[in-house]
Design a protein with these regions (language model features):
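Acidic/polar, glycine-enriched structural segments that form the non-catalytic walls/loops
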Residues: 1-71, 105, 113, 146-165
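Aromatic-rich carbohydrate-recognition surfaces in CAZymes
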Residues: 73-177
Length: 177
């Protein structure tokens, strides 16, 4: 980029300070350090997964273009559905709306027709049980962050009715697992 390390470091400090200025907190130095460290962790993953022109390799291994949204990956939803995504709905709603759209694209490009379980770089690694993306979508819709309810509902129903995943066939037949 023709910039020195010092110039890049200063640009990173400026970007980070623009994120921090949205928060005014009180507490001890240790409590503030804990808050800002946790905030930093919310900005690491999920990560942007597309080229500068919006192209990305989808779950179907084809090249797709993110139109009108930023595509994300690294959805460790077992870890993030309870706190990170609800937090992002409050402080970074546009970012979380893009994550929800990315999850829906994941479902549409999946041979299983499922929202992400634990996606990594255009692949599903199936390392957790459950389908926590449904909670993320429902929360984003309820908070007014994501408005394409029909598309989201179709993805949630598709995900929750895949018969060969996590005993769903037995649940649908018997009403319990």
């Amino acid at each position: 980029s023709g910039k020195s390390f010092e110039q890049l470091a200063e640009a990173a400090r400026t970007d980070w300070n623009s994120e921090l200025e949205h928060f005014e907190i009180e507490g001890t130095p240790d409590q503030k350090a804990m808050f800002y460290t946790s905030l930093y962790h919310t900005m690491i993953n999920p990560s942007v997964y597309m080229d500068v022109d919006g192209s990305y390799r989808g779950l179907d291994h084809n090249i797709h273009r993110a139109e009108g949204f930023t595509n994300y990956t690294i959805f460790s939803l077992w870890d993030t559905y309870r706190a990170e995504h609800p937090f992002l709905n409050l402080v970074k709603p546009g970012r979380n709306a893009d994550m929800v759209e990315s999850m829906i694209k994941h479902e549409q490009q999946s041979v299983h027709g499922m929202l992400p379980i634990w996606s990594l770089m255009g692949n599903e690694n199936w390392c957790m049980s459950g389908y926590h993306a449904v909670s993320v979508l429902a929360d984003a819709i309820t908070k007014g962050v994501f408005s394409n309810v029909d598309e989201a509902l179709a993805a949630m129903v598709s995900t929750s009715t895949v018969p060969y995943y996590e005993g769903i066939a037995d649940y649908m037949k018997l009403g319990y697992i």
